[in-house]
Amino acid sequence: MKKRFLSLTLAAAMVMSLAGCRSAEPAATTAAPASEATTAAPADGEKKEGASEAETASAEDFKIGIITGTASQGDEEITQANKMKEKYGDMVVTSTYPDNFTTETETLISNAVAMASDPAVKAIVWCQAVPGTAAAIDKVRETRPDMIFIAGTPGEDPGVINPKADIVLQVDEPGCGVVIPPQAKAQGAKTLIHYSFPRHMSYALIVARHENLKKYCAENGIELVDVTAPDPTGDSGITGAQQFILEDVPRQIEKYGKDTVFFTTNCGMQEPLIRSVFENGAIYSLQCCPSPFHAFPAALNIDMAGHEADVTYMMEQLQAKVDEYGMNGRVSTWGVPCNMLFVNAGVEYAKKVLEGETNGEVLDEEVLKATIQECAKEYTPDANMTIEHYVDDSGNEKDNHFLVMSDFVTFK
C-alpha cells in the first residue's frame, strides 16, 4: 500500500449487533453445479463436532461450496469465489442466488440443495447470506445434517440466522454508526443524507446503525437527513433505484451544500451514489459493505482487468481519481474488502476444519480469528481487523456470530 497518499484513521470497534449491508437486492442467481456434499451441522443450540481423525480428508477427498450473488449488484463476492476456485480447483464448487431472492426463495433454496446433493461437499460458505438462507440451511440439513455452514453478511436478523449457521461473519454495522460521524466531520461534513427503504429499516442491525448515526451525528454537529429511496427488489427494480439516486443527490446538494456526506444501506445504489458525489463535489465516507472495490471501479471508470483483487492497484487508482476530481480529504473507505474477506476466510477456515486443524469442533474461535487476520493481510499487509462477538439486546453474547471492523483509509 502506498502510504504516501493514504492516511489511516483507526475505526473503533463496537461490540453491538450485526447487520450486514445486505445487498438489499442481492446478487442474482444462477444454478451452480450439483457437485457438492456435507459434513454435519449441529441441531439448534448444540455444538457440532469437527471432522474426527478418521474422517479428516485430504483436499481431494472433500469439496467446499460457495454461494454468492451474481455481478448485477456487485461482483466482489463472485470474483473472490472464482479466485478460490482458481486456487483450489475442483475442491471448490460455486453457485449463485437470484437477484430477486425475496420473491424467488424456492430457487434460492433449490440451488443450495443442488449443491449439497454432492456427498463430497462438506461445507458451504454463503455470502451474502440474504433472506432465505436460514430456510435453505434447514432444507439442506434434512438430508445433510452434518453440513457446515458459514454465513457472511447476513440479510436476516441474528435471531433467525444464528441458530442455523455454524458461523456468522458480518461487518460491525452498529459500530459503523459510531465511527462514520466523526470520520465525516473530519472530512468537512455538516449534513449526512441517509438513503434506505422500509424493508431495510426493519433489519435489527441496520436499525442499530441508524440509531448510532443519529446519536453520533448530533454529537459531531452533523444534521442527519433520512431519505426514502425505492426498494431495488420492488417494481422499479435496481434500475429505478439507481436512477432515483442519480436524480436526488444533486437536489440534496443544492439544498444542503457540498459539505454533505452521503450513505445508503443498499449495495446496488453505491455506484450511482459514488458517481454523483464525485461529479458534484460532496463527501463519501463509507459503503454499506466497506471495500476499496465496492462500486468504485464502475462508478469512476477504473479499468480492473488483471487487477481484480489487487488492493494496492485499486488504492492508487482511487487516489488518482480523487486528485482528478479535487476530492482530496473528502473520500474514504476500508483497505480490506469485507465481503471478499468473508468468502476467502470462510473457505480457508472450512478447509482447516475438514483437514483436522481445529480443536475438534466446527467453531474454533482462536483458529477462526487467526484465519480472518491472515486473509485480511492478503489484501492489505498492515491490516488489523477488530473481531468481536455479537451481543443481543438482552446482553447475551453469541459465540458463533462475529462482528468485524477495519480502519478508514482517507484519500488525501
PLM features: residue spans?
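Periplasmic-binding protein-like
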Residues: 64-68, 119-130, 147-152, 193-194, ...
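Hinge/cleft segment of the Venus flytrap/periplasmic-binding protein
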Residues: 314-412
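Extracytoplasmic "Venus flytrap"
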Residues: 57-84, 88, 93-111, 125-131, ...
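Hydrophobic alpha-helical segments within soluble ligand-binding/sensing domains
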Residues: 167-194, 244-247, 313-322, 337-354
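An alpha-beta-alpha
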Residues: 81, 173-226, 350, 373
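Extracellular/periplasmic periplasmic-binding protein-like sensory domains
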Residues: 217-224, 271-355
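Bacterial lipoprotein signal-peptidase II cleavage site
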Residues: 20-31, 35
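Flexible loop/hinge segments that line or gate small-molecule binding clefts
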Residues: 140-173
